[in-house]
Amino acid sequence: MPTINQLVRKPRKSKVEKPKSPALNVGYNSHKKVQTNVSSPQKRGVATRVGTMTPRKPNSALRKFARVRLSNLIEVTAYIPGIGHNLQEHSVVLLRGGRVKDLPGVRYHIVRGALDTAGVNDRKQGRSKYGTKRPKA
């Protein structure tokens, strides 16, 4: 335990909390070609690679992912939720934060039903999360 004198000389530092989705906290001024620190809830990007990835132990699957170059010129890996997708290279996608626990390095989700990403077909429940319109009764 430090003495009062030691604390006077060098006070305690508060912990610095780092963001969970750092690419959303960076903006880009294309006119000045400089990055700014403007946060946004979602970001637009272009898919540069679409593929599958295996999760960490104890799970086993082929999880769909896309490598995305964002509008702020940062390239990130994003998860494609739902069953089936229509994404390919050069598709324009909308990204939100949110990691995938069993995929290392995946900190973002692609928003289904926005921009070039279609919603999930034949989905009856939880439709808003997967960009599916209400079925005709």
From Swiss-Prot:
> What are the entry keywords?
Methylation, Ribonucleoprotein, Ribosomal protein, RNA-binding, rRNA-binding, tRNA-binding
Q: Which Pfam families match?
A: Ribosom_S12_S23
Q: List the disulfide bonds.
A: none
Task: List, alphabetically, the CDD domains matched.
Answer: Ribosomal_S12
Q: What are the GO MF terms of this UniProt record?
A: rRNA binding; structural constituent of ribosome; tRNA binding
Matches recorded under InterPro entries:
NA-bd_OB-fold (IPR012340), Ribosomal_uS12 (IPR006032), Ribosomal_uS12_bac (IPR005679)
Q: Does the keyword RNA-binding apply?
A: yes
Keyword tRNA-binding applies: yes
Region spans: Disordered: 1-57
Spell out which residues are annotated as carrying 3-methylthioaspartic acid.
D102
What's a single GO CC term here? small ribosomal subunit
Any single GO BP term: translation
Q: SUPFAM superfamilies annotated for this entry?
A: Nucleic acid-binding proteins
Q: Which HAMAP family match?
A: Ribosomal_uS12_B (MF_00403_B)
What biological function has been recorded for the protein in this entry?
Answer: With S4 and S5 plays an important role in translational accuracy.
Family note: Belongs to the universal ribosomal protein uS12 family.
> How does it associate, per the subunit comment?
Part of the 30S ribosomal subunit. Contacts proteins S8 and S17. May interact with IF1 in the 30S initiation complex.
User: What name has this protein been given in UniProt?
Assistant: Small ribosomal subunit protein uS12
Write down the species: Streptococcus pneumoniae (strain Hungary19A-6)
